[in-house]
A protein has these predicted regions:
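C-terminal non-catalytic interaction/assembly regions of soluble proteins
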Residues: 244, 250-383
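Active-site rim loops that border cofactor/substrate pockets in soluble metabolic enzymes
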Residues: 78-82, 171-231, 319-323
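Glycine-rich phosphate/nucleotide-binding loop
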Residues: 9, 115-129, 208-298
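Glycine-rich phosphate/diphosphate-binding loop of Rossmann-like nucleotide-binding domains
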Residues: 39-43, 51-55, 59, 136-191, ...
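N-terminal glycine-rich phosphate/adenylate-binding segment common to multiple enzyme folds
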Residues: 69-124
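Glycine-rich oxoanion-binding loops at beta->alpha junctions
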Residues: 3-15, 70-93, 129-137, 193-206, ...
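Short, glycine-rich nucleotide/cofactor-binding loops
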Residues: 28-42, 129-140, 256-263
């Protein structure tokens, strides 16, 4: 009889908490390391209390105590970090939010921001960590990491855009090959007049894609700017932080914030972590990696590595006689621009290089444009 009464009491308590927080069911248990912030430990505890009101069972690791939050007492930051790792490893908590963590190569974090133009939420893949030592391979993997995180957050078919940084066009070509192989995802379209899936700064501000793909250093800068632009930079006030570490076979839920993160952002990071628990992020990850590999991911990455090897020295190619260059072909990586022009010279087509508002261009006569495009596509310079 006592067990029945306890069960009924627990059920009514969960219902009451659900009505108060708007979140029903078992609360995800998320640890927060509170020591080490540039804004003091009170800032972290304030965040813990805010998240607790939103349906997160917060385990605060530090020296402060407050009603509604479970405190795990530690004496210093290092002890707190070790305690957090123990709790995650043992399953005492479902995940953790912390200011630093040594992710292995192949794992990087997917941040989440609120974009200023229209208030849209956008995932940035990625923001810390290293998906690969190779830039293009890393951005290909980052795309999958971003899709995983967005799907675990409840977006069934997230749109993907690539920031116009070095490697964007090669990443786009590789992802189109993956798409042709059967991996399902949807491209975002730039809000700029020329469209396309390679996006510009305007698209970042507007939140054009659900998932913005870039290298992690660029992503880190974007997170900092979008979370702290209204405060002068010392206090990250908006957004959800640098996000969870995602990688193949990696099943520890660790979310990253920074020492400059303010209470509102840390609270959002705790909610973000809870959303990943509810969305079964690691089950989603296993399915997405399996689907990508079935579509030829490993072969695409292997081809990318082979293409990145230094080519054997060739005889110097001389330019054909000059002629007016009235046509142009975009979409070539800036590092490949000169080689692309020489590939056309070798075929007897006079070409010049330039930089348009959308990026690098190879220019030639209108009469040679179609043939030049075929040559560049065959050589792998354009998709």
């Amino acid at each position: 009889m006592m067990n029945l009464e306890q069960t009924i009491a627990k059920t009514f308590l969960q219902m009451a908490e659900g009505l108060e927080s708007g979140s029903f069911g078992v609360k995800p248990k998320i640890a927060l390391t509170g020591m080490g912030s540039e804004h003091g430990e009170k800032n972290a505890m304030e965040a813990a209390l805010m998240a607790a009101k939103k349906g997160v069972d917060v385990y605060y690791i530090g020296t402060l105590e407050a009603e509604g939050v479970t405190t795990i007492k530690v004496e210093n930051e290092d002890e707190g970090h070790k305690k957090m790792e123990e709790m995650v490893e043992s399953g005492e908590v479902d995940g953790a939010v912390t200011m630093h963590f040594p992710f292995p190569i192949g794992v990087s974090t997917v941040g989440k921001v609120v974009t200023p133009a229209k208030g849209r939420e956008m995932f940035i893949a990625t923001t810390t960590g290293t998906s690969s030592a190779d830039r293009i391979e890393g951005m290909i993997k980052n795309t999958i990491y971003g899709i995983i995180t967005a799907k675990a957050s409840g977006i069934a078919d997230p749109t993907v855009g690539i920031l116009n940084v070095d490697g964007a066009r090669q990443t786009e070509m590789a992802l189109n090959q993956l798409k042709e192989g059967g991996y399902q995802f949807s491209w975002a379209t730039s809000a700029r007049a020329d469209g396309g899936a390679v996006l510009r700064g305007n698209d970042v501000l507007q939140g054009t894609p659900d998932v913005l793909v870039c290298d992690s250093l660029t992503g880190n800068v974007l997170i900092k700017m979008l979370s702290a632009y209204s405060t002068g930079g010392s206090f990250e006030a908006t957004g959800y932080g640098y996000g969870p570490g995602i990688g193949k076979g990696y099943h520890k839920l660790i979310h990253i914030i920074s020492r400059a993160s303010g209470a509102p952002l840390i609270a959002n990071a705790l909610v973000y972590a809870a959303d990943m628990v509810r969305g079964k992020v690691f089950e989603v990850a296993d399915k997405e990696f399996a689907a990508a590999e079935k579509a030829g991911l490993d072969k695409i990455l292997a081809a990318r590595k082979a293409a990145a090897k230094p080519a054997e020295a060739e005889d110097e190619v001389k330019a054909p006689p000059a002629e007016p260059c009235t046509a142009s072909i975009p979409g070539i990586e800036v590092m490949d621009l000169e080689d692309a022009a020489k590939a056309l010279w070798k075929a007897g087509i006079y070409a010049e290089t330039g930089m348009g508002c959308t990026g690098p261009l190879v220019m030639m006569s209108e009469a040679n444009k179609e043939k030049a495009a075929e040559i560049l596509k065959k050589a792998g310079y354009i998709g």
